[in-house]
Design a protein with these regions (language model features):
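Structural motif
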Residues: 6-12, 32-35, 69-75, 94-99, ...
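Conserved catalytic-core segment of nucleotide-activated headgroup transferases in glycan assembly
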Residues: 150-218
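N-terminal pre-catalytic "stem/leader" segment of glycosyltransferase-like enzymes
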Residues: 1-86, 332-340
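C-terminal alpha-helical cap of glycosyltransferases
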Residues: 304-307, 324-340
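Short acidic alpha-helix that forms the nucleotide-activated donor recognition element
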Residues: 214-225, 245
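Catalytic core of nucleotide-activated saccharide and alditol-phosphate transferases
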Residues: 73-178
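A short hydrophobic beta-strand element within the catalytic core of glycosyltransferases
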Residues: 228-229
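Catalytic binding pocket for nucleotide-activated donors in carbohydrate/polymer assembly enzymes
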Residues: 232-233, 237-325
Length: 340
């Protein structure tokens, strides 16, 4: 069985790819930085010294795998790129949060990434089109096609020693939520830029902040609500694909309205939103174009919610079709990468 090691700072990346590896019949080992196992917690700037010392300490272990994949953040790949001539396996760099996160001033790293593109045992794979656009701004040209999150996970620990309390899942994650009309994103724009829950109450709609423990928690929570509302703050979110798979209708600003909102004081959007990049945000991808309910003004929310109520079965049917298509395509993409 093909052996795969996945290193990441991001629990969601590990869970998403765990599903992929399970479906493809791969023998997967996960390492999350918060466990302080191989990679250290909160160490995002991977210098050449850190990369080489980590490689030296774990070289034999690393070479026991057929594939090693790194995800959020991409600089973890430096451990292997600096020592690629000694690495016996295949390296996959799944770029999930800007390839140069915390590495902007390290010219040697930028050169290393650029020179690694196209190597026989290296595949640098963006998880959304914006990652390619961002890299090109730094004269790094990715050649692999985008492979997006599949948006599903399995109810299985990442590791025998997994402790969800260590990654924040022991805190306030919505166990008390009874249900209502709308689940609202719990991130900056819906809580600090404005209070979207209160806005829904102004429109006589019941709403709660979307708090849950992983994919399974979202599946259960979604059963209690009619729709989900978000003011986007990233080009891609695992939640965008999870909501599609679960079949919870999504209400959000149109591209033009989002661009207008993004210019407001204190509205946050990761890496900035520009007129020519709004369209590559995954909340407006070819799937969401078929089922999302876009608004051009907050005043449209009550009528839009009414449409959800009246046509929920049809909307969910479209979401189910899109989810099936997306899962099939994504698994085929990874199947080619792993040659299985």
């Amino acid at each position: 069985m093909t052996k795969v090691l996945h290193l990441s700072h991001h629990y969601g990346c590990l869970k998403d790819h765990q599903y992929v590896c399970d479906k493809l019949g791969l023998d997967l080992t996960n390492k999350l930085s918060i466990w302080n196992d191989i990679i250290k917690r909160d160490v995002y700037c991977i210098t050449r010294e850190i990369a080489n010392s980590t490689w030296k300490e774990h070289k034999d272990y690393f070479n026991s795998f057929d594939f090693i994949i790194t995800s959020d953040t991409a600089p973890l790949s430096r451990i292997f790129l600096e020592n690629i001539d000694e690495f016996k396996g295949q390296l996959i760099v799944w770029v999930c949060n800007r390839f140069n996160y915390e590495m902007h001033d390290d010219d040697a790293y930028l050169t290393l990434m650029s020179e690694s593109v196209g190597k026989d045992n290296v595949k640098i794979i963006p998880y959304t089109k914006f990652e390619t656009m961002w890299a090109e701004a730094y004269k790094v040209k990715f050649t692999e096609e985008v492979i997006r999150p599949i948006g599903v996970s399995i109810d299985k620990p990442l590791s025998e020693n997994e402790d969800l309390g260590l990654i924040g899942f022991g805190g306030d994650y919505g166990d008390e939520l009874k249900g209502g009309d709308l689940l609202v994103s719990r991130y900056h724009n819906d809580t600090l830029w404005q209070d979207s829950v209160k806005m829904m109450e102004h429109y006589d709609l019941s709403a709660d902040p979307c708090k849950y423990r992983g994919y399974k928690g979202l599946v259960e929570l979604a059963k209690k609500y009619e729709a989900y509302f978000i003011l986007p703050e990233q080009y891609s979110k695992f939640a965008a694909f999870e909501l599609m798979n679960i079949g919870l209708p999504v209400i959000l600003p149109s591209e033009d309205f989002l661009f207008h909102l993004s210019s407001a004081n204190n509205y946050w959007f990761g890496s900035g939103l520009y007129k020519n990049t709004t369209e590559v945000c995954e909340w407006y991808n070819e799937y969401y174009d078929q089922f999302a309910l876009y608004i051009d003004d907050f005043e449209e929310i009550p009528e839009t919610f009414k449409i959800v109520k009246e046509h929920k079965k049809k909307i969910r049917g479209i979401m189910k079709k899109c989810a099936k298509e997306h899962q099939s395509k994504t698994l085929d993409q990874w199947r080619k990468i792993y040659n299985v």
